[in-house]
């Protein structure tokens, strides 16, 4: 394992916020994790797991030991007549893993292309885009208990997946939005994911439920697009809407799309018939947060060096630069102001 003291965190968060970690450990294997948990200085200290840094806002220096997950590896672990089972190390860049599966002839993750972050973070957030969520393609994961050092595995039901939710976002005493996970099983701060396995179903079927993808299909003049075509379309759409963090610091889509009951949606539509909304499998209605923010006049506005992206209101951006970056406080002030106005 590689241990760094007073380590800069600006390179490790896509918003480009300046902060430091008192101790940062670059974890490149399961053995590295066990070494951390056996170290007399590191073992008793609080831990904080860091993947790609695309889903965090740093509001100050980090005192817990930062575990920078860099476990690599991509492989097909099983193939049946119904699915491919693919395993990826937690430190693999998510988009690279998606591209690898397609290159190997294992379609199914193409709608999730270009989502920032690492593989290990994907179950934590239950990432999703363009009609597909991680839980739709999830098989199982391996993790290590940070208190005991014991390894364990979880299947989809045990992960308690919900909308951008899982057991990894809840403390042990908190319930999750998932219907199959009992109270007392939250794993936030208690476990670190090392490997994730995906079940990619056969036969493959395209998911084209979103208008942007359907437009691309019509423009291409095809009835049944390939997985590679969908991958390319998703990448084009995301690049048109979302800024490159290397050029303009951001954390991707900052806000969750709110969900309401059908009755609430009917009331909202009566006030504004143009509101963008989508039915959900559980009977609720998802409202487009970006549309709501834009309708409230926030697109393009700023608070200090934190701003709302001109092309996509869901995205907050860093309008500072490396030597005079936005602060986490400015980002959170802007976010709270937007939430207050929308609600």
Where does each model-flagged region fall?
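Phosphate/pyrophosphate- and phosphate-bearing ligand-binding catalytic cores of soluble enzymes
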Residues: 4-5, 10-17, 151-328
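Short amphipathic alpha-helices in soluble, non-transmembrane regions
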Residues: 36-40, 209-213, 334-339
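Beta-rich strand-turn-strand
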Residues: 106, 328-334
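Residue-level signal for inorganic ion chemistry
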Residues: 29, 53, 117, 149, ...
């Amino acid at each position: 394992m590689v241990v760094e003291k007073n380590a800069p965190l600006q390179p490790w968060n896509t918003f480009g916020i300046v902060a430091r970690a008192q101790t940062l450990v670059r974890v490149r294997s399961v053995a590295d994790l066990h070494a951390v948990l056996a170290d007399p200085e590191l073992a008793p200290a609080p831990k904080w797991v860091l993947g790609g840094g695309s889903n965090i806002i740093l509001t100050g220096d980090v005192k817990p030991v930062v575990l920078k997950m860099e476990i690599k590896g991509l492989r097909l672990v099983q193939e049946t007549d119904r699915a491919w089972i693919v395993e990826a190390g937690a430190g693999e860049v998510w988009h690279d893993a998606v591209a690898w599966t397609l290159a190997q002839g294992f379609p199914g993750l193409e709608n999730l292309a270009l989502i920032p972050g690492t593989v290990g973070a994907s179950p934590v957030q239950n990432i999703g885009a363009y009609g597909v969520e991680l839980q739709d393609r999830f098989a199982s994961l391996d993790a290590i208990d940070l208190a005991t050092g014991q390894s364990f595995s979880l299947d989809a039901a045990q992960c308690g997946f919900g909308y951008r939710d899982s057991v990894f976002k809840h403390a042990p005493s908190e319930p999750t939005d998932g219907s199959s996970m009992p109270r007392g099983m939250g794993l936030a701060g208690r476990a670190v994911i090392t490997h994730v396995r995906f079940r990619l179903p056969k036969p493959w079927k395209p998911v084209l439920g979103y208008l942007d993808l359907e437009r691309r299909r019509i423009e291409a003049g095809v009835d049944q697009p390939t997985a590679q075509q969908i991958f390319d379309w998703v990448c084009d759409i995301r690049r048109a809407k979302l800024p490159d963090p290397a050029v303009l610091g951001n954390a991707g889509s900052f806000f969750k799309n709110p969900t309401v009951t059908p009755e609430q949606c009917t009331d909202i539509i009566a006030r504004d018939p143009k509101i963008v909304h989508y039915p959900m499998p559980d009977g609720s209605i998802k409202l487009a947060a970006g549309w709501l923010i834009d309708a409230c006049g926030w697109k393009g506005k700023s608070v200090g060096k934190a701003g709302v992206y001109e092309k996509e209101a869901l995205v907050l951006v860093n309008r500072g630069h490396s030597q005079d970056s936005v602060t986490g406080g400015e980002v959170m002030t802007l976010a709270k102001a937007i939430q207050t106005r929308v609600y």
